Amino acid sequence: MSDVTHANGAVANEADDALVIGDHSFSSRILVGTSRYPNPQVMLDALEATGTELVTVAIRRVNIENPAPESHLDLLRRGGYEVLPNTAGCYTAREAVLTARLAREALGTDLLKLEVIGDDETLMPDVEQLLDAAKTLVDDGFTVLAYANDDPITCRKLADLGCAAVMPLGSPIGSGMGIVNPYNLRIIREMIEDTPLIVDAGIGTASDAVTAMELGYDGILVNTAIAQAQHPVDMGRAMRKAVEAGRSAHRAGRIPRRLYAEASSSMEGRIGT
């Protein structure tokens, strides 16, 4: 990739623009879910198209202790992907902590995507249980990536607890509604400067990914938008390009919005003057 030169002379080297989460570093800023694909081969092809290095797996849906040949985990490992176990399906802090510890023991990773859901219809986080689980798991040495509401106060509390990344939702899980509250996401970004922020849930197409990155977010997590697309591999490729474009645009610095027009050409030298 090329360097980006800012107006003040600063140069942003895109090749060195790694996503750092705790002690882990990734060149790709896309995290991808591994469910709902038409078949395993489509999943693998789509993952490759995104350029992702970190893929998330729901622990309750896989046999982590005795993964059979050609199992979900086996395919991902042989593909060279780092697995990010998640606690999807947990409704209490106790369930999430137990699931996380089982995953660490079986998979040998400190990485964890923490989800503590409040109900089956909205799949929104239960904030009280989420904060309780986050504190316990951070104290227990996990590198916690916490799925959260798009609430600035909750997100700040998660960052203050020591979560390695905070993942506010763009809209409800699987809805494809995109970024429905960019104002809250912008406030969260301004309030939390030193902790990676990743938009998780609701992304429906590539333009949503661009929006997330232009808001200054460090990455996105996407699953349904790719897995359920008419052509998952093409959508995976589109997401990769969208994240790169949005990241570059954010780093380049957009022009301020103006209420009135401003001519781009000088008015000097007009004919008849």
UniProtKB/Swiss-Prot annotation:
GO molecular-function terms, A-Z: thiazole synthase activity
Subunit (UniProt): Homotetramer. Forms heterodimers with either ThiH or ThiS.
Binding site for 1-deoxy-D-xylulose 5-phosphate: G174, A201, G202, N223, T224
Catalytic activity: [ThiS sulfur-carrier protein]-C-terminal-Gly-aminoethanethioate + 2-iminoacetate + 1-deoxy-D-xylulose 5-phosphate = [ThiS sulfur-carrier protein]-C-terminal Gly-Gly + 2-[(2R,5Z)-2-carboxy-4-methylthiazol-5(2H)-ylidene]ethyl phosphate + 2 H2O + H(+)
Source organism of the structure: Salinibacter ruber (strain DSM 13855 / M31)
Keywords for this protein: Cytoplasm, Schiff base, Thiamine biosynthesis, Transferase
One CC-aspect GO term: cytoplasm
GO biological process terms, semicolon-separated: thiamine diphosphate biosynthetic process
Signal peptide range in chain numbering: none
Cross-referenced CDD domains: ThiG (cd04728)
Documented EC number(s): 2.8.1.10
SUPFAM superfamilies listed in its UniProt record: ThiG-like
Keyword match rRNA-binding: no
Protein name: Thiazole synthase
Protein's cellular compartments: Cytoplasm
Keyword Hydrolase tagged: no
Active site (UniProt): K113 (schiff-base intermediate with dxp)
InterPro entries xrefs: Aldolase_TIM (IPR013785), Thiazole_synthase_ThiG (IPR033983), ThiG (IPR008867)
Family to which the UniProt record says this protein belongs: Belongs to the ThiG family.
Enzyme class: transferase
Record's function text: Catalyzes the rearrangement of 1-deoxy-D-xylulose 5-phosphate (DXP) to produce the thiazole phosphate moiety of thiamine. Sulfur is provided by the thiocarboxylate moiety of the carrier protein ThiS. In vitro, sulfur can be provided by H(2)S.
